[in-house]
Amino acid sequence: MSSTTRRRSAWVAAATVGVSSFLAVAGITPAIAAAGAGQPATVTVPAASPVRAAVDGEYAQRFLAQYDKIKDPANGYFSAQGIPYHAVETLMVEAPDYGHETTSEAYSYWLWLEALYGQVTQDWAPLNHAWDTMEKYMIPQSVDQPTNSFYNPNSPATYAPEFNHPSSYPSQLNSGISGGTDPIGAELKATYGNADVYQMHWLADVDNIYGFGATPGAGCTLGPTATGTSFINTFQRGPQESVWETVPQPSCEEFKYGGKNGYLDLFTKDASYAKQWKYTSASDADARAVEAVYWANQWATEQGKAADVAATVAKAAKMGDYLRYTLFDKYFKKIGCTSPTCAAGQGREAAHYLLSWYMAWGGATDTSSGWAWRIGSSHAHFGYQNPLAAWALSTDPKLTPKSPTAKADWAASMQRQLEFYTWLQASNGGIAGGATNSWDGAYAQPPAGTPTFYGMGYTEAPVYVDPPSNRWFGMQAWGVQRVAELYYASGNAQAKKILDKWVPWVVANISTDGASWKVPSELKWTGKPDTWNAAAPTGNPGLTVEVTSYGQDVGVAADTARALLFYAAKSGDTASRDKAKALLDAIWANNQDPLGVSAVETRGDYKRFDDTYVANGDGIYIPSGWTGTMPNGDVIKPGVSFLDIRSFYKKDPNWSKVQTFLDGGAEPQFRYHRFWAQTAVAGALADYARLFDDGTTTPDTTAPTVPTGLQAGVVTSTEATISWTASTDDTRVTGYDVYRGATKVGTATTTSFTDTGLTASTAYAYTVRAFDAAGNVSAPSAALTVTTKATPSDTTAPSVPAITSSSSTANSVTIGWSASTDNAGGSGLAGYDVYRGATRVAQTTALTFTDTGLTASTAYEYTVRARDVAGNVSAPSTAVSVTTKSDTTPDTTAPSVPAGLAAMTVTETSVALTWNASTDTGGSGLKGYDVYRGATRVGSTTTASYTDTGLTAATAYQYTVRATDNAGNVSAASAALSVTTKTPQTGGSCSVAYNASSWNSGFTASVRITNTGTTTINGWSLGFDLTAGQKVQQGWSATWTQSGSTVTATNAPWNGTLAPGQTVDVGFNGSHTGQNPNPASFTLNGASCT
């Protein structure tokens, strides 16, 4: 299951205007008093220009192919009004409880899609149309929020506590608890000349399936006969309320549906209730909209077309002005509040400056006796932060909002957000949950020992716990992509530090093995961050994250790739670039279908469709005695299930799958096409095209060198540690697969591995294979035989080691310790385990260890434990705290000169070089190497290898290498190496790999063509026969024609040159009549291929 959007209502708030009957549960429908439903104007899905300029580059072509699938009206991504659905499919329950709802998230991804389309094609009309559609249907119009003029910034809302379980609701409004003042309300009104709020509401029922008819601009609750989109809300009742426990309600309440007070008294307790409107914005979606428009303006300006997007840019700046409400505490209380009676905030005392979960606003429908309210949010999740948007809103003159204090607010927010990421970053890279200024949603005192961030308490799962909000890896992709964008756009050093730690963790946890590709799915967190100290961050040695499951969520994979690509483009890191490319290639080759891309999803959680309430547990809670009806007549009463108040699901074309499951059958499976995920894939393809693809990308087909020097380390009766000498690669080695006999027992990203669960007194043979980001795998190493120790009778642990020395640089710590002894007659000392905080960072037989890759000016705590052959482990040594040196210590020492320069592989057009790694003793750390061909620098690399391409056959070249460190010091040049490229050979050959994925009457074929000869192919034509009546319908990356059974694919302008060993991927969608055999043979330029 993709966890996608998880939105919360703004809980409970009401304007304090002397009337006690105002329910203000944020995020419900508009309060329009217009009569008559009216017919929504039919808005066709905005296609791109009917004629667009030719686009070069394989990945730009892929982007356009995916874009065209999304924008094809026949594929069902948009409604008749031109509104993007959450998904093509209707039977879908996640944050939206129906696939044909929409979210502010979907609109923000649409804006991203059109921004990228404008960059690729220079056509900006679709972007402007997307914003106009959002403004019309997702931002409440003036008539939808009619009583904002009554809003009083000095008394924003009436307090009502949140609770941890839905059964504690409704929540009593309490005017005796004072809130603070709203410092931006009057300013916004003065700036824009009215009191309207310019934010998207987060959720809408596009097809009016519920029948509330809360139609933007047309009416309040016009009922089931109203056509077009309808503002609705769901989440209202605390962190335990999952989507399965929600009661849908209109965002405008006229008491037509629900109970006697509509739906209000399910959520808030009051003496009486008034008709009203209420909306909730989701901060990440509005910020993403600003983010997309920032890039659109950059690209349009580069094209000389800034005027084409100027109006949309101005609207995005306005949205950013109002988005500031999410930077404030819910009831504008001071930051660090731990009691409902804590002091109310004045001015910026209530600003936490983080993008919190929402802001919300509402008011009366009666304009003759109006009232209105506004709230921020106390809860901040790292996955909602957007430092790129904050930076743009505070530094880009075109995007800086008009309000006088907006620029300063967003500048403070950018810095605070980056600190937030740093505070929450686990010692091994992942970003933990978030923080709250209102513990338990009621300003309670946090438990003793709760770490804090500027007074806000750490929460591992902010906002919701069913499932925990930071279990889903997608939050990592979403949150960190924006950090990577900021780093790419501005070079921000703090953003880079976050990424330098996050990227290797992510890269190591992605597999790109063809159809079995996978990315992390669920995470497990251990420990907590330390209380934040901006002057001396600790690096959180006591906080770690573990990937507990993997999956094929195409949207998460694509947004992860986008984060890696922005980082790679700025840093020059090839491992992240190549991993992202390989991931996108795997999805493109294995997951395409006629609607876009997809993977099979098994939905065991659909068992909750018919769950009923269990006291203090799961299920929809309806208070005793409460009854009401949905617009279609479904009864709402205690004991109802999710399905009972959504009976329309029983008519869904896919319902039989679910019913079979509920009756005891197999878990249902689906191929979903979520709008955000499809757009994320398109975005990643466009990013690669823009940042890396010049139309002549040469795939990496060279495997790393074979690992050598295998040797045994610590060996006990049940464990064996082995190590080896690092391999080299033409790009970068990304890991090693370790085999025990013929069985792969693990993967390592370093040059050592510990195999556990072994049998005593048994010989095991180990081999190791190296692999790179492109998936190339080396031959196995020479085998190493290790014999485990005999089962000992020793149950006594060795003596405790004592740390005797420590030293540090800016990026490393070295510790030494005294030798331990084992008991007389014992099994013997095996080695030592070294811990940084709670994380074991090394096993060694030596008495010293150097920990590298650390952060400057940061304190780290180390302990050492001794281990004997029997597996007994000593108590830890006394901890020693070591602080790394400051980056400000000037490093003026150059790295050592690279030695051992050699040519590994030489072809007619390329030379693969390797050399021995340099060392750096100046403290700043080795940065990389500059490679020179003659006097010209031809490339830089972070590893001790480099491949120079585009050379001329039979030509002599001379190479030297210089090492660089992070302080900018450069070594002297290595000894020169002369290399002559190979002489061209006559003749040529080819191979073709053909894979087809079939369904019903259609199929997608992926074709990989490889030049296996020794000469370059300039221009190619592939031929083959489809012998069972199959037809080619749509192809990509080539010009496709078919005559009878014969199919011909001719190269595109950008992939016609195939160097020896080079591969090109093409493909097509086709139809069949029941049989779909693969072609029996292939020709390339008339010659047969294998």
UniProtKB/Swiss-Prot annotation:
- CBM2 domain: residues covered: 983-1090
InterPro entries, from UniProt? 6-hairpin_glycosidase_sf, 6hp_glycosidase-like_sf, CBD2, CBM2/CBM3_carb-bd_dom_sf, CBM2_carb-bd_dom_sf, CBM2_CS, Endo-1-4-beta-glucanase_dom2, Endoglucanase_F_dom3
A single GO BP: cellulose catabolic process
Q: Is Transmembrane among this UniProt entry's keywords?
A: no
EC main class here is: hydrolase
| Reaction catalyzed | Hydrolysis of (1->4)-beta-D-glucosidic linkages in cellulose and cellotetraose, releasing cellobiose from the non-reducing ends of the chains
Q: Where is the composition biased (Polar residues)?
A: 1070-1090
Coiled-coil regions listed: none
Pro-peptide residues, renumbered to this chain, are 34-53
Residue segments, region Disordered: 1069-1090
Does the keyword field hold Phosphoprotein?
A: no
Its signal peptide is 1-33
> Family assignment?
Belongs to the glycosyl hydrolase 48 (cellulase L) family.
Spell out the protein name for this chain.
Exoglucanase B
Q: Which organism encodes this protein? A: Cellulomonas fimi (strain ATCC 484 / DSM 20113 / JCM 1341 / CCUG 24087 / LMG 16345 / NBRC 15513 / NCIMB 8980 / NCTC 7547 / NRS-133)
Q: What is the lineage of its organism?
A: Bacteria, Bacillati, Actinomycetota, Actinomycetes, Micrococcales
Gene name in the database record: cbhB
